[in-house]
Amino acid sequence: VGKVSSANHRNKYKAILCRFPLYDKSEVAINAQGWKPASLVSAKANIKGVPLMIFSTHIPGQLEVEESAAAFIAENLISSSASENLFILGDFNNHLNKGALKSFNKVGVRSIWKELPIDTGNISTHKHIESGNESGVIDHIFFRTKTTKVNVTRGGIISSAYNSPEAELQMNRYKKEWLKYGKPLSDHRPIWAEFIFSADNSNR
């Protein structure tokens, strides 16, 4: 769990959870346009002999690539990473291949939405808690491998992420809206993907 709370909001930290040990853990502050502070947490893992470099982030969206948080990540972290298998995921506040996320097209990462493939034009990962308006797909999982073959076999959006009807949470804001929309776990719907790694004609 990182120590930088997004935009100084209460408890908006980035985290990486893993069934396997994590090591070389760190957090990088992002110096870019948009709300501040923004950051990215990272950790390494080794899962059944497959080394992974994992990044989790929450950044402001931007209409342009220049000086955006996405460009900062692409230029300063993804491009310079020597990791064999790199994964970067989180809330990017931009649609795939739009706005600031165009910067990811230049650094060789692939999107689970393109690999599955899933048309993101008519689905959404975020519902604005006050208005109920949908933002479209602004949460993403990107990945890059150098020599190991990897296939995305399954994945999508979890639309049933709600608290139980009996749940009661203390909150100063959005209590009425939280009740109105069925007590969701978050204003963002979780996304997931299954990756199959292959090396020497064997699956992992």
What are these regions (language model features)?
Residues 37, 64-68, 163-167:
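A short, polar/proline- and glycine-enriched secondary-structure boundary/capping micro-motif
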Residues 10, 66-70, 131, 135:
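Solvent-exposed, acidic/flexible segments
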Residues 27, 78-86, 94-204:
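Metal-dependent phosphoester-hydrolase catalytic domains
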Residues 1-55:
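Structured beta-strand-rich core segments of catalytic domains in phosphoester-bond hydrolases
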Residues 42-46, 51-55, 65-93, 97-102:
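His/acidic metal-ligating clusters that form di-metal
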Residues 7, 33-36, 64, 92-95, ...:
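Acidic-and-aromatic substrate-binding clefts and catalytic sites of carbohydrate-active enzymes
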Residues 17, 22, 52-54, 73, ...:
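Hydrophobic beta-strand residues in large extracellular and virion-surface proteins
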Residues 2-7, 18-20, 30, 56-60, ...:
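Active-site-proximal beta-strand/loop segments in catalytic clefts of secreted hydrolases
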